[in-house]
Amino acid sequence: MSKSLEKYKLNAKEKNNLEKIEGGYKINKDLLIAEEYLNNEHNIILFDLKSEKKILNISFHQGYITSFHICKKPLYIDDKEIIYSNDSFYFLSSSLDKKFALHQISFNNSTNEYSNYTLISQCKPTHDEINSVIQIENGQILITARDQSLILFSNKIKNGNFEKLFEINQPWPMAPDLLFEIRNNLIGVSWEYDDAEADESYTEEMEKNNHSNDGIFIYSIDNNKIIEKKILHGYYFGGKYSYIVMEDKLILKKNSEIFVYNLNNYELKFKFQEYTYLKMKPLMKNILLYIIKMVLKQ
């Protein structure tokens, strides 16, 4: 298997059998692991690109998977190192059933054929739904949950149990959305103000304080602890974040707004409205793109 797992976007119009698949990771030239939305369920599937057939459906979480993440760094099960290789790979999943889990899929590397699936371990660390799970550069595991928690776990699993190392909590009623690693052990988490969970008095207090708990929080992972570095405030108008990291720049998009931050000092370098760009004439688009290019070089 290639050591650089390829993010693989699918075109539903080209392959009818892939109509419900959102995207996934290409494991080798014939196998794809992907998310599938079907009949109000969200599952993980293994798909054979050559035959265009689904060969494995993982619905361990009762059809309510919130995220999955390929493990590219070593894990240790009862002190034995495991890592993706020519005949197997490992991934994490999280769910609305308050669990996250570690899975293994084995295959014949010479024929690219699937051979076996194993649920290695599962963990129920909170009393609420788990939004996201990722493995970071040092091999450790992070999750966010709707009980306002961000939890760090060791990459060592003993007797089937994940070891919790550290936990932080945001004030109620903040809900996590995006969880991602910016670069080596530097983490971004978006905490969203959840109107549905707040009462009127709390809403008024938040508005007075300009929603001081919203936005992208930047954390470092150091000595098995989660350390808050910086808060990028003010983007609390609903919608989902997406992001790109380019060298020392963090580019965030939410709704129609795009923000460019310098990761050395977390200053906002540039922002613009996507719909403004789309309405521009070609010459003005080129000028704006040139300005953005210059800003990114600074």
Where are these regions (language model features)?
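Intrinsically disordered, low-complexity acidic/Ser/Thr/Pro-rich linker and tail segments
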Residues: 1-45, 191-197, 202-217
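A short beta-strand motif characteristic of beta-propeller blades
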Residues: 6-17, 53-58, 118-123, 161-169, ...
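Canonical WD40 repeat/beta-propeller blade segments in eukaryotic WD-repeat proteins
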Residues: 18-25, 63-83, 127-135, 172-180, ...
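Short coil/turn segments that connect the beta-strands within blades of beta-propeller domains
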Residues: 29-30, 87-89, 138-140, 183-185, ...
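Conserved strand-to-loop turn within each blade of WD40 beta-propeller repeats
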Residues: 35-40, 94-97, 144-147, 190-193, ...
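WD40-repeat beta-propellers
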Residues: 44-47, 100-105, 151-155, 219, ...
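Short loop/turn segments immediately following beta-strands, especially the blade-tip
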Residues: 104-113, 154-160, 221-223
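Blade-level signature of beta-propeller repeat domains, shared across WD40, Kelch, NHL, RCC1
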Residues: 283-298
